[in-house]
Amino acid sequence: MITLKQALSLSQDELETLKNEIDAKVRASDLNAYIKAPSLNGASAKGVPILIKDNISVKGWEITCSSKILEGYVAPYHASVMENLHQNGMAGFGLSNMDEFAMGSTTESSCYGITKNPRDKNRVPGGSSGGSAAAVAGGLAVAALGSDTGGSIRQPASYCGCVGLKPTYGRVSRYGLIAYCSSFDQIGPITQNVEDASILFDAISGHDNKDSTSANLKPTQTFKNLNRDKRFKIAILRDHIKDASNEVQLAYENTLKALKEMGHEIVEKKMLDSHYQISIYYIISMAEASSNLARFDGVRYGRRAQNIKDLKELYLKSRSEGFGDEVKRRIMLGNFVLSSGYYDAYYLKAQQMRLMIKEQYNKIFEEVDLIFTPVAPTSAHLFNYHASPLEMYLSDIYTIGANLSGLPALSLPVAKDPLGLPIGMQFIAKAFDEQSLLDVSYALEQELDLKLD
């Protein structure tokens, strides 16, 4: 597939040809990365076609978050990132499959069915932005937008062999993103290479008056300033690596060796056990989800239950029929931790611990430029692999720290396991220092020159 950098130099006629080629490929594909053929919606404007995750509002398109409860909901406005794309020569073209309401790590909970990993169709693409990553890796999209709440851009990028960037919280507007967890969610790019990630990130970044959490900063110019010759002081967290598979640990050590040979300084640091981060993340995210999803009741928009006797039954039936099992589970747990008698014991303590984790990151970043970790404990696993929801939650162990602390992080493919499946590693940077993430990843990408196809 043509890269985003190359596509931006195409004429309007050439772009129309490209869109027709993508549409034909999507119709012929069995990956189920797109919800439907992109030509059925058409492009959101003239420009390079960008795949959009199904929780980002595109005016005139049915946006469902891959959930039955939003069937028939047509977005009445563009998300701010869509307006930014249009101003930078890009446009939405197609909606990607995802875990329902972004709650999952496998893209198995979508009401549209599973998405397959293009590297091995018996395996998951990761989630929740699994459709976006599968499409980019499978040659079905030039580039894509995803959202990252606890690793939902970086983990599927790692499983599929793409570059995935989670920006600093507040760097990219969330206006028009259908919320899962408002204090964690961030929109970001999934692309074929680091240059494309930089270009797409620059296009969507910047202050937005319609988002009260948006940082008052101008759009970034990371692509213009990409520098592969910069050298960084990089921290590693040895105690956290023990949970990774042997293949991931080997890829980690080999990448560390490459970073040292490139001239980067590597230092060891310590942090709170990452298993605590899992508990903190899920308590807070489920609490916020139970509040955010209370708006879907069958009254104002989306699916409405039939043959009901009163308002209470309308609420009960609409939500019971509309939400999938994983979403129901998280709503119930969220309501539990917010209930009287448990609020102080769970939610309040989790918020206090979140602040402590953020302070630990800040302390490390007083002495280093970047932190280097795996993205996931394993490469992509088979469908129905997890015996329990808790096992699935543990797959986020390396990614949630950046969300808890609001820091930027980037997933870069660095190796293949014995089955030929991609393995990604992650850099985390100081708040609003996406430039360093992209610089070090750009240099490492060229140094490793990994061939996945």
From Swiss-Prot:
- Coiled-coil ranges per the record? none
- An annotated GO BP: translation
Gene designation = gatA
Query: What Gene Ontology cellular-component terms does the record carry?
Result: glutamyl-tRNA(Gln) amidotransferase complex
- One Pfam family linked to the record: Amidase
Give the multimer and partner information.
Answer: Heterotrimer of A, B and C subunits.
EC numbers: 6.3.5.7
Q: Which controlled-vocabulary keywords does the entry list?
A: ATP-binding, Ligase, Nucleotide-binding, Protein biosynthesis
Concerning Gene3D superfamilies, the annotation shows: Amidase signature (AS) domain
Q: Which organism is it from?
A: Helicobacter pylori (strain P12)
Q: Which GO terms describe its molecular function?
A: ATP binding; glutaminyl-tRNA synthase (glutamine-hydrolyzing) activity
In terms of InterPro entries, this protein maps to:
Amidase, Amidase_CS, Amidase_dom, AS_sf, GatA
PROSITE patterns linked to this entry: AMIDASES
Where, by residue number, is the active site?
A: 53, 128, 152
The chemistry this enzyme catalyses reads:
L-glutamyl-tRNA(Gln) + L-glutamine + ATP + H2O = L-glutaminyl-tRNA(Gln) + L-glutamate + ADP + phosphate + H(+)
Family statement drawn from the similarity comment of this UniProt entry: Belongs to the amidase family. GatA subfamily.
What this protein is called in its record is: Glutamyl-tRNA(Gln) amidotransferase subunit A
First-level EC class: ligase
Q: Briefly, what is this protein's role?
A: Allows the formation of correctly charged Gln-tRNA(Gln) through the transamidation of misacylated Glu-tRNA(Gln) in organisms which lack glutaminyl-tRNA synthetase. The reaction takes place in the presence of glutamine and ATP through an activated gamma-phospho-Glu-tRNA(Gln).
